[in-house]
C-alpha cells in the first residue's frame, strides 16, 4: 500500500481522481490547520491518528452514511425524546429553562473535552461513558479515545470559532449529559464524535441534530466507517464513488447560517437564548 507524503505546501490527493486503498489510508503529513481541514473535508478526507504519529488522512470504501429520513428511532428512545420535546413552560417554573433540553453550539469546549477522555469507549450510544460513536478506520485494532489529541482539540476548536464545526448538547437538570460534534460544509454534515453520561443522552442529541439538519435542507450525515451500531440507527454503507458524488453535490450548496441556542422539537432554534 502506497501512502502519499504531503508537505505543508502540497495539496492533498483527491480520492475522486487518485486511487485510494479500500481501508482508506492514502496520505500522511504534518500540517493540521483549519485551511488543511477545509481542503480535506471538501475532498472527502478526514484525519485520524494517534499521538506520536504524523497526521493520517482517510477516505474509506465503503463509507457509512446516515440519510436523515432513515434514522431509526426505537420505541424507548422515542419516549425519551418526547420528554425533551416539552416546551420551556413545562419546566418546574413557568418560563424558566426546562430541566431537559437540547442545545446547539452552547458548550463546544466541554463536548470535545468529554469526547477526548482517555480510554473512552468508541461504540455504544447511550452508555454512561464518553467515546467515538462514529469510529475512524482502525477502531477495531484496539486504539483508545486518545485519537482526539490536544492538536485535534486545538484545530477543531479554532474551526468551530470560524463557523465550520458544531456541537449539539443534551442537558438534564442543568447539567451536560451528552452530546456530539461534527463539521458542516454547505448541505453536508460530517459526524466526528459523541459522548454520553446518561442513558440515551447522545442518541437524543443525534435525533435533534437530524431534525435540525432536515430543517436546514441537509439530507445526510457522514458516519465514516461501517459498524453494526451505526447500522442499527439506520446508517448504511455507500461506495466511495457514490459518497463523493453526494459530497460534490452538497459541499457548495447554499445553506442557512448556523446559530446557537435551544433546539426546538421541530429542529429549529429558539429565538431567545437559553438560560
Question: What do the predicted segments below correspond to?
Answer:
Residues 1-275:
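N-acyltransferase acceptor-side catalytic subdomain
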Amino acid at each position: 500500500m502506497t501512502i502519499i507524503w504531503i508537505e505543508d505546501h502540497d495539496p492533498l490527493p483527491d480520492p475522486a481522481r487518485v486511487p485510494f486503498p479500500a481501508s482508506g489510508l492514502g496520505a500522511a503529513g504534518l500540517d493540521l490547520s483549519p485551511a488543511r481541514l477545509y481542503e480535506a473535508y471538501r475532498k472527502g478526507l478526514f484525519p485520524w491518528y494517534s499521538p506520536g504519529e504524523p497526521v493520517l488522512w482517510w477516505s474509506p470504501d465503503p463509507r457509512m452514511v446516515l440519510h436523515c429520513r432513515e434514522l431509526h428511532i426505537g420505541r424507548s428512545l422515542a419516549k425519551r425524546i418526547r420528554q425533551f420535546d416539552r416546551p420551556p413552560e413545562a419546566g418546574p417554573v413557568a418560563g424558566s429553562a426546562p430541566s431537559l433540553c437540547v442545545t446547539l453550539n452552547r458548550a463546544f469546549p466541554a463536548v470535545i473535552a468529554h469526547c477526548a477522555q482517555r480510554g473512552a469507549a468508541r461504540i455504544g450510544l447511550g452508555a454512561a461513558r464518553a467515546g467515538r460513536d462514529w469510529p475512524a478506520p482502525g477502531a477495531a485494532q484496539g486504539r483508545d479515545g486518545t485519537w482526539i489529541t490536544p492538536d485535534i482539540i486545538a484545530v477543531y476548536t479554532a474551526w468551530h470559532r470560524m463557523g465550520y464545526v458544531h456541537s449539539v448538547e443534551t442537558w438534564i437538570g442543568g447539567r451536560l449529559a451528552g452530546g456530539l460534534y461534527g463539521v458542516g460544509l454547505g448541505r453536508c454534515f460530517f459526524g466526528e464524535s459523541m459522548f454520553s453520561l446518561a442513558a440515551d443522552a447522545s442518541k437524543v442529541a443525534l435525533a435533534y441534530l437530524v431534525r435540525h439538519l432536515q430543517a436546514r435542507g441537509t439530507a445526510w450525515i457522514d458516519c465514516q466507517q461501517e459498524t453494526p451500531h451505526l447500522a442499527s440507527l439506520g446508517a448504511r454503507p455507500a461506495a466511495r464513488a457514490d459518497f463523493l458524488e453526494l459530497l460534490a453535490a452538497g459541499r457548495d450548496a447554499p445553506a442557512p447560517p448556523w446559530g446557537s441556542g435551544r433546539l426546538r422539537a421541530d429542529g429549529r432554534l429558539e429565538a431567545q437564548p437559553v438560560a
